[in-house]
Amino acid sequence: MAIINMSALDLQGKRVLIREDLNVPVSNGVVTSDARLRASLPTIKLALEKGAAVMVMSHLGRPTEGEYNSEFSMQPVVDYLEKALDCPVRLAKDYLDGVEANVGEVVVFENVRFNVGEKKNDEALAKKLAALCDVYVMDAFGTAHRAQASTHGVGLYAPVACAGPLLAGELEALGKAMDNPARPLVAIVGGSKVSTKLTVLESLSGIVDQLVVGGGIANTFIAAAGHNVGKSLYEADLIDEAKRLVANAQSRGGDIPVPTDVVVASEFSPTASATLKAVDQVADEDMIFDIGPDSAEALAEILKNAGTIVWNGPVGVFEFDQFGEGTKRIAQAIADSSAFSIAGGGDTLAAVDKYDIADKVSYISTGGGAFLEFLEGKELPAVAMLESRGE
């Protein structure tokens, strides 16, 4: 279905309201990680170049809805954008009943979550936002899975609703990875719990050629294979589920490989002493914190031969270097692979940064929850809204 792309529109003299994901960490009034801000800059710059009066809105943190709280103010974002855009940028605190916006400047709305009804997608709030603009641009993939007033409702009532370049690029990359992927398609799903990623694992096991599990999730699969996991984080109640997923994958000619060697310790701490063990030698007091080098090499070989790689989640506690070798090897293998690769999710992006492979990954997704819901095959409300407005 055709979604209108902002890049194709004439915006000269138009009031353009862009919903970005500018939810960044702030400490003492200063932005401490600017990845999302950097990702939004090309869209804002393009709207300025096209001669628009640009308004930008986003949420930041989780304030109590309807209450102003300076801790969650957009002011640090305004300060950052003013330096990055080299044009006047100002904060609008009260904007719902009208706001002055001029060509050549950027007006940043105060945190949308200070508005009562934002999360519930309140119709009256959505209509007020829509009345502020000639063109509404949804560019926040990170919140595309939420039907809220600033991400969904406003687009139903704005004169024109379109996708910004960041969102359009995200959908194109995800489509390339999932709709018609170059085979073999390999997915790496890490993280601590099977329960939080069960639907993703279900969905992926039906379409990928090889599903690789890591982190705490892998421990449940190790237990399902009949091995002792000691005191490791795992979910005993999901062992049958893990067995079923493996059987499903194998019936399709795929597999969910279980590590053959693991790195264990007796405590979870930055100074814990790491010990390498065969997977069938794990003792009752051991905790598994990483895959071993043999397992990492086997996975690297799978990645080397892949046509498409989807990476969501590390395979070990990589924050501690002694348990980071598995994730480091996976990161290196993805960097070296000729496959189309897409990485998403907070921990994954931290690993991409730590091992300095950002320029070797084909596409880095800005979405966490939205990335997972896309992988699950769910319809994203904001995308559905844009499709309905594009017809």
Curated annotation (Swiss-Prot):
Write the Enzyme Commission number(s) for this entry: 2.7.2.3
State the protein's name. Phosphoglycerate kinase
The cross-references to InterPro entries, in alphabetical order and at most eight, read: Phosphoglycerate_kinase, Phosphoglycerate_kinase_CS, Phosphoglycerate_kinase_N, Phosphoglycerate_kinase_sf
- Which GO annotations describe the biological process of this protein? gluconeogenesis; glycolytic process
Q: Where does ATP bind?
A: K197, E319, G345, G346, D347, T348
Question: What pathway does the annotation place this protein in?
Answer: Carbohydrate degradation; glycolysis; pyruvate from D-glyceraldehyde 3-phosphate: step 2/5
Output one GO MF annotation: ADP binding
Q: Which organism is it from?
A: Shewanella loihica (strain ATCC BAA-1088 / PV-4)
**Which GO CC annotations does the UniProt entry carry?**
cytosol
